[in-house]
């Protein structure tokens, strides 16, 4: 790596440690020519993930959309912010562990519902009602019957 001070191409690593969020490695380097020290960061290159929406348009994956949907579904329910974050983490991990560069929004919705069902059934039904666009009370009842029968 080129020294930012003199441009020399060789250095030695003096110190190496993970950043606080564990998403990168911070390295202190020393130039072998001018002996000045500088910091570099090494991190995994993220390939942007595209979400294919119902209308077939594409947009970049946005974790905050998952969090916002979960927050609405869990409003006034005994679900902590930590649990909501864990669900978002779980969904994001499933997505990033796949080799896909595009994913359908419906697949993301199903992953969210699968995780939410384990945490709070009422929040699950709320999320499902918006996500699956329940049209009437019969659709609600059908979903609740499925939930009860799968216990």
Curated annotation (Swiss-Prot):
For this UniProt record, give its keywords in alphabetical order, as a comma-separated list: ATP-binding, DNA-binding, Metal-binding, Nucleotide-binding, Repressor, Transcription, Transcription regulation, Zinc, Zinc-finger
Note the InterPro entries from the entry.
Answer: ATP-cone_dom, NrdR-like_N, RNR_NrdR-like
Q: List the disulfide bonds.
A: none
List the unnamed zinc finger ranges: 3-34
Q: Which Pfam families match?
A: ATP-cone (PF03477), Zn_ribbon_NrdR (PF22811)
* UniProt function note: Negatively regulates transcription of bacterial ribonucleotide reductase nrd genes and operons by binding to NrdR-boxes.
Protein name, UniProt field: Transcriptional repressor NrdR
Species of provenance:
Clostridium kluyveri (strain ATCC 8527 / DSM 555 / NBRC 12016 / NCIMB 10680 / K1)
Q: Give the taxonomic lineage as stored in the record.
A: Bacteria, Bacillati, Bacillota, Clostridia, Eubacteriales
The gene behind this protein is: nrdR
């Amino acid at each position: 790596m080129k020294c930012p001070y003199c441009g020399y191409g060789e250095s030695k690593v003096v110190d190496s440690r993970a950043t606080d969020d564990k998403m990168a490695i911070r390295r202190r380097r020393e130039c072998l020519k001018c002996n000045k020290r500088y910091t570099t960061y090494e991190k995994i290159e993220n390939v942007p993930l595209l979400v294919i929406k119902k209308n077939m348009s594409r947009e970049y994956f946005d974790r905050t959309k998952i969090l916002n949907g979960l927050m609405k579904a869990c409003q006034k329910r005994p679900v902590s912010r930590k649990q909501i974050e864990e669900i978002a983490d779980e969904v994001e991990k499933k997505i990033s562990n796949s080799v896909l560069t595009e994913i359908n929004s419906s697949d993301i919705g199903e992953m969210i519902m699968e995780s939410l069902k384990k945490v709070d059934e009422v929040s699950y039904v709320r999320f499902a009602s918006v996500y699956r666009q329940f049209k009437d009370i019969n659709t609600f009842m059908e979903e609740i019957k499925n939930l009860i029968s799968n216990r």
